């Protein structure tokens, strides 16, 4: 008997949600998921490298790899290993110096429409070499934040795709508007308004 009432209550909730927009939505994005996004979008080259200057075939080059993210207070810190051969290319050999510093940039998460973005890039640690910093600064302050953008609405739509099989109802996200983003422990917590339809 209890199962019948539970099913009826679930059906009524689904019916009401299908008729009116369901407003409050909270989405949690883990640090690992964000790190995976950065690696897939920026470090998708051979061996997970992103060439800032030159290529794998160049005598002299600068590339970044091994991106690690951590959450510190209300900011995200990206720690990236850099490898560089700086100098002059002579007959296919780089005459100069080799460097392998670790760089860090701190970013503030924010919401814009359906997207989780990152801004206010602050360099925490870069190389001691001015010629390398000339290449690293734009990479850390522009390319890293733009490659970490997450379409929150798309994430939710993918998560809801299997709803018909699991519940018998087709649940779809029609609209999402992000209001705030906060860091809680190892998660990025996104508060948003969303219109969800149940059919």
What are these regions (language model features)?
Residues 1-9:
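Bacterial N-terminal signal peptides that target proteins for export
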Residues 9-18:
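Bacterial N-terminal signal peptides
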Residues 23-199:
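Extracellular/lumenal and peripheral-membrane lipid-interaction modules
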